[in-house]
Swiss-Prot record:
This is Triosephosphate isomerase. SUPFAM superfamilies: Triosephosphate isomerase (TIM). Keywords: Cytoplasm, Gluconeogenesis, Glycolysis, Isomerase. Signal peptide: none annotated. It is an enzyme of class 5 (isomerase). Involved in the gluconeogenesis. Catalyzes stereospecifically the conversion of dihydroxyacetone phosphate (DHAP) to D-glyceraldehyde-3-phosphate (G3P). Its EC number is 5.3.1.1. The lineage of its organism: Bacteria, Pseudomonadati, Pseudomonadota, Gammaproteobacteria, Pseudomonadales. One of its GO terms (cellular component) is cytosol. Substrate binds at N9, W10, K11, G173, S212, G233, G234. Pathway: Carbohydrate biosynthesis; gluconeogenesis; Carbohydrate degradation; glycolysis; D-glyceraldehyde 3-phosphate from glycerone phosphate: step 1/1.
Length: 251
C-alpha cells in the first residue's frame, strides 16, 4: 500500500521572521504518523527550517536543484550535494512555473532529475497541462509526453525512487481546482502509462495532486484511488490549514 504524502511548496515567500512564525505554527500541529509530510522553503531558509523542525517528523525539501550534482562554478545555482548537506531529502523538478516562466525544457529537467538522485535525494517530478491544452483535449498527451521524457532517458525503474506530482497549470494559484474525478482521471492515466513499462513500479509510485488544494477539498481529492496526497502551494503558508490538509491525507 502506498504511503500518503503531503508536500508544501512555499515558493518565493518568506522572511526570516515569517518563516520562524510558520515553523512555530507547524510545531504545534497534531500531524498523522501515517503520512510523509514535507515542506520546501526558498533555499535561503533551508537551514533555518531544518533546524526549526528537527523535533518534528516533517522533512525538508528544495524547490529546485542545479543540473550538476556537485558544487562548482555555476553562479546562482545550488547543487544537490549542497542541498543534501543542508538536510534536504527531496527536490521539486519540472514545476510548471519553471517550465512556463523560466523556460526549462525536458533536457535540462532530465539533468536535474539525475543530479538529484545521484546525491540520494528524491525528485518530485511535476507534470501538467495549461488551460489551452486542456481546452484542446490534450491533457493526457501533454502529461504523457512530459513523463515519457524521463522514462526514455533513464528507464521506468528510475521512478521507483521518485514521486510524481500532477499539477494542472490552470489550477495553480487561481483558486480553480480540477474536480476529484478530473484529477483521478489523469492520475489513473499516469499509472496506466507506467504499468505499460512495469506494473510493479506503477503500483508503487506515489502520485500527488497539486492545484489549489485546501482543507475544504482535500478529503474528497485524497479519497480518489490513484491520488496519494498533495503538492500544496498557498495553503502551505498557513500552519493550521496545512495541518488540516495533512490530517485529511491521514484519514
Amino acid at each position: 500500500m502506498r504511503r500518503p504524502m503531503v508536500a508544501g511548496n512555499w515558493k518565493m515567500h518568506g522572511t526570516r521572521a515569517s518563516v520562524a512564525e510558520l515553523i512555530e505554527g507547524l510545531c504545534k500541529q497534531s500531524l498523522p504518523g501515517s503520512v510523509d509530510i514535507a515542506v520546501m522553503p526558498a533555499s535561503l531558509f533551508t537551514c533555518q527550517v531544518v533546524d526549526g523542525l528537527k523535533a518534528t517528523s516533517i522533512i525538508v525539501g528544495a524547490q529546485d536543484a542545479a543540473i550538476q550534482a556537485e558544487q562548482g562554478a555555476l553562479t546562482g545555482e545550488v547543487a544537490s550535494s549542497q542541498l543534501a548537506d543542508a538536510g534536504c531529502k527531496l527536490v521539486l523538478v519540472g514545476h510548471s512555473e519553471r517550465r512556463q516562466l523560466i523556460g526549462e525544457q525536458d533536457d535540462v529537467l532530465n539533468k536535474k532529475f539525475a543530479a538529484i538522485q545521484a546525491k540520494g535525494l528524491t525528485p518530485v517530478l511535476c507534470v501538467g497541462e495549461t488551460l489551452e491544452e486542456r481546452k484542446a483535449g490534450q491533457t493526457l498527451e501533454v502529461v504523457g509526453r512530459q513523463l515519457d521524457s524521463v522514462i526514455a532517458e533513464f528507464g521506468v525503474n528510475a521512478l521507483v525512487n521518485a514521486v510524481i506530482a500532477y499539477e494542472p497549470v490552470w489550477a495553480i494559484g487561481t483558486g480553480l481546482t480540477a474536480s476529484p474525478q478530473e484529477a483521478q482521471e489523469v492520475h489513473a492515466a499516469i499509472r496506466a502509462q507506467l504499468a505499460k513499462e512495469n506494473a510493479e513500479v506503477a503500483q508503487g509510485v506515489r502520485l500527488l495532486y497539486g492545484g489549489s488544494v485546501k482543507a475544504a477539498n482535500a478529503v474528497e481529492l485524497f479519497s480518489m484511488p490513484d491520488i496519494d496526497g498533495g503538492l500544496i502551494g498557498g495553503a502551505s503558508l498557513n500552519a493550521d490549514e496545512f495541518g488540516a490538509i495533512c490530517r485529511a491525507a491521514g484519514n
